[in-house]
Amino acid sequence: RGFTLIELMLVVVIISALAAMVVPRLAGRTEEARRSIAAADIKGNLSLALKLFEVDNGRYPTAEQGLGALLQKPASPPVPKNWKGPYLEQEPLDPWGKPYVYRQPGTHPPRDYDLSSLGPDGVESDDDVKNW
């Protein structure tokens, strides 16, 4: 005995209703997960790489040198004398595929630098993820 068309359609309607309830909840979690990844990158990997650079060279990279100074020895002054990098394996991009924003000197104590992700909209706004 097979299923009738009505029974199959009822199953499809039930599955669609369940999907309609679950998908919006998962969509919000994706953005939340990206924000968590950006915060972990900023407070973890990138801060550690910047600290290692500072320990080796006695200072953080300048704003002009940027986070690229963690990948290859900067040629612009002040050229680090004791560069032992690379301090990162690849160019750091936030979960939205954009470069992290690095400012040195920082304007938010107690850090000597400001590090942030501009978030999903890619502009400075309330959705940014910051190290301060």
Task: Please describe what each predicted stretch is.
Residues 16, 40, 111-112:
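Short amphipathic alpha-helical leader/targeting segments
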Residues 8-12, 50, 77, 89:
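A residue-level detector for conformationally permissive "hinge/kink" positions
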Residues 14, 31-32, 109-110:
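Generic secondary-structure boundary signal with a strong preference for alpha-helix termini
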Residues 22-76:
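Conserved hydrophobic/amphipathic alpha-helical signal-anchor segments
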Residues 55-132:
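Periplasmic/extracellular, small/polar-rich flexible segments of pilin-like filament-forming proteins
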Residues 1-26:
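N-terminal single-pass transmembrane signal-anchor helix
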